[in-house]
Amino acid sequence: MFSHPLSKMKKLHILLPILFALLPILATAQQNSEVIDLKKHKIVIQFADNDSLAQVRVTQQIGNVLRCWPNAEIEIVCLAGGLDLLMTSKSKASKEVADWTAKGMVFAACNNTMKNRNITKEDLLSQAVVVPSAIVELATKQEQGWSYFRSGK
């Protein structure tokens, strides 16, 4: 069947404005490769690194997760050298810890590490919670269905 050239022009006349209207949306979708998932994910992160850059990185990782999973529940369990993140005298990310705990994130200090290093609750940032054992806390969270990750070296 033969179609008239003007009918093709009419189709283009209609389709081109629609295509141009969609271009910004398509470009934005392509640039934003983050997948937003509103499910309530639960993540427990082991942090045992005393490096100051690692302290900042672990707090940045929270932001990375929350950009994709805004309803995620996150707990950072600090042990060994990672306890420095929660110490008032050594933390390089105390502002970030305060900001994230205000948004519901949990920063837990291992009591066994505290005893071994002669650290008291008063030595910690006010936002820190103390758990009896980092390993027990991590295992308990995993048994409750939390995903486990390790940050730092």
Question: Would you name each region that the model predicts?
Answer:
Residues 1-31:
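Bacterial Sec-dependent N-terminal signal peptides
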Residues 30-153:
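Secreted/extracellular ectodomain signature
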